[in-house]
């Protein structure tokens, strides 16, 4: 699924209209999609739904939704920012729907009456084409709505049964058409008066602003609904959002006559006296998504600890100095590493392994690489390090590590994560996995894809080790670097979503992801 700018979406809609899928038809489908989503959350009959309607097409989408919910038995109220008179308004008047306009309601008494007991508020005030600061009547309207919503939610009662608190329902449910009014759909900026949504329904494609903060945090659950546009109209758009269909097409096959060699051998060069968990997390993750054989190349001083933590791995104890891999480990590692499909280097190494990393990336070639954590931090200290790394490696930095690799500030990286990832993937000749909410995968040829996950449950120690092991396993099973990175990140994100739904956003530990990785793989493939 592609991610589009406002201008790209405008061109797609214009081309669709010119080819026979008219604006009116697209509006009917858009409004119907919002109605369908609302009805999937609550019974329409008997529900009270308040629509906040602006003067443009976003308001038109809202009016179509209002008509359809009225026909489904909902009690509908329409509150207009400005008076409007079109076929949608005529249809609602014929149905006896309550309609009020802000200029005719100077005390907002009609608005307040509906806000006091509605079940759903639909924000259809401004859509993707608006980027100006909120002001005037629109600002006043949103302030009134926000105040009433806050007051209602503060009064909600927590029921208690058997001394176990029951979660209070969020009432009213706030649904945004395209996204909350005040969102800039090109850069994710958010007006301070924007009304955060519980869910947003956007059309045809997600917009760039849906994936960039702070705006992304105000969209709630994002649902993308088709409106009849031709997918071919987006073929020239580079930025994509990963989805199950795409990932399924890339996942490695599992032939019935396979043996463990079929699914690749992963060498994991990792660990230190201070970090004995990282190698185990990475190795277990690799096995959990299908790697045939995993070998842990770790400091010999922690070999006993390693062998007690994991039964399935094989081991290559290497020389170390004070618990970190030493320069002397390089020759022993090189004697074995050529027979492996991929090498993951970095989890838990610590920066005390500097001489080891410096020597390893000299001389003869290495197998395909996934570089994580302290491998990245140590490479960043080497001038023109990317020329010493066999291309295309997969690099998995978080923003702090990316800052060290690039020399940029974290703030500069976070300001435009996609552009930064693409720029340096091209420059370095390696695949970049820039971790974080909506992780970015960028390839040297300019391809890029965003993960659809913004999950605080993944912000936990060891989560990156699980990700690195998952990506390494995908690479070992024969995927190209870009596809391996995308599949690994998607499986990791899906496992994180499963853990969050079962456990909550707090309390998930990296080990919780391991048991869910096979379930994530099963759910996609």
Predicted region positions:
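Nucleotide and nucleotide-moiety/phosphate-recognizing core
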Residues: 36-127, 131-177, 359-362, 386, ...
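Small-residue (G/A/S/T)-rich helix-start motifs and N-terminal tracts that mark the onset
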Residues: 1-81, 197-199, 208-369, 377-395, ...
């Amino acid at each position: 699924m592609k991610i589009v700018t406002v201008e790209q979406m405008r061109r797609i809609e214009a081309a669709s209209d010119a080819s026979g899928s008219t604006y009116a038809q697209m509006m009917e489908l858009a409004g119907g999609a919002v109605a369908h989503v609302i009805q999937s959350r609550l019974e329409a009959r008997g529900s009270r739904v308040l629509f906040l309607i602006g003067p443009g097409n976003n308001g038109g989408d809202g009016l179509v939704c209002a008509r359809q919910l009225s026909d489904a038995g909902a009690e509908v109220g329409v509150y207009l920012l400005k008076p409007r008179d079109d076929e949608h308004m005529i249809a609602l008047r014929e149905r006896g729907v309550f309609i009020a306009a802000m200029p005719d309601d100077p005390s907002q008494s009609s608005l307040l009456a509906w806000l006091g007991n509605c079940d759903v508020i639909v924000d259809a005030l401004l859509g993707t084409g608006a980027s100006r600061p909120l002001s005037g009547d629109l600002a006043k309207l949103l302030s009134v709505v926000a105040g009433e919503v806050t007051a209602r939610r503060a009064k909600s009662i927590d029921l208690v049964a058997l001394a176990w608190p029951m979660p209070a329902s969020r009432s009213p449910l706030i649904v945004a058409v395209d996204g909350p009014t005040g969102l800039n759909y090109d850069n994710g900026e958010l007006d301070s008066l924007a009304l955060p949504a519980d869910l947003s329904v956007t059309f045809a494609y997600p917009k760039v602003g849906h994936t960039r903060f702070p705006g992304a945090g105000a969209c709630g659950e994002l649902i993308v609904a088709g409106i009849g546009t031709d997918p071919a109209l987006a073929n020239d758009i580079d930025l994509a959002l990963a989805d199950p269909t795409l990932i399924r097409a890339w996942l490695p096959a599992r032939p019935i006559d396979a043996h463990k060699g079929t699914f690749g051998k992963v060498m994991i060069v990792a660990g230190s006296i201070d970090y004995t968990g990282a190698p185990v997390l990475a190795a277990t993750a690799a096995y959990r998504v299908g790697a045939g054989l995993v070998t842990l190349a770790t400091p010999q001083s922690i070999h006993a600890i390693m062998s007690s933590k994991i039964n399935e791995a094989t081991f290559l104890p290497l020389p170390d100095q004070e618990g970190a891999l030493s320069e002397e480990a390089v020759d022993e590692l090189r004697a074995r590493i050529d027979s492996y499909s991929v090498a993951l280097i970095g989890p838990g190494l610590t920066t005390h392994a500097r001489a080891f990393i410096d020597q390893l990336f000299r001389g003869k070639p290495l197998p395909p690489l996934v570089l994580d954590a302290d491998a990245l931090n140590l490479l960043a200290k080497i001038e023109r390090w990317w020329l010493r790394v066999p291309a295309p490696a997969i690099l998995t930095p978080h923003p702090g590590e990316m800052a060290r690799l690039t020399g940029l500030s974290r703030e500069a990286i976070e300001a435009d994560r996609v552009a930064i990832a693409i720029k340096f993937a091209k420059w370095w000749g390696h695949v970049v996995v820039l971790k974080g909410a909506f992780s970015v995968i960028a390839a040297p040829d300019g391809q890029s894809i965003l993960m659809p996950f913004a999950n605080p449950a993944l912000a936990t120690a060891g989560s990156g080790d699980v990700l690195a092991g998952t990506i390494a396993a995908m690479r070992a099973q024969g995927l190209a670097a870009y596809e391996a990175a995308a599949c690994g990140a998607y499986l990791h994100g899906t496992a994180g979503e499963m853990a969050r739904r079962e456990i909550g956003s707090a309390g998930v530990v990296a080990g919780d992801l391991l048991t869910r990785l096979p379930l994530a793989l099963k759910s996609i493939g």
